[in-house]
């Protein structure tokens, strides 16, 4: 394992059960795992907003910020609702404008989850 590797935990039981970290930083690169969010039942925008809030916390714990994000991947269970998620993404990233991919998936780990987001960041050395 690289000596300049930092792992970030959110404390989720899933991390130990699955064997992953919320985020990992190696040198200037930070990868944040697929992150879901909470919100009122069926509110995909609220879930996206909360997922991005959790991603921001993980980035901060790894010594990065939303302004360092260069790529996001968004997984939604209903692509017809893409605009709701896109609006939240645009609000969070403003002029940062990382490259992004959004795809529809058949399901996430729990049936009430509607969106999951990954982020990659690069921190200037």
What would you call each of these model-derived segments?
Residues 1-125:
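Short, polar/acidic, helix-capping and beta-turn segments at strand->helix junctions
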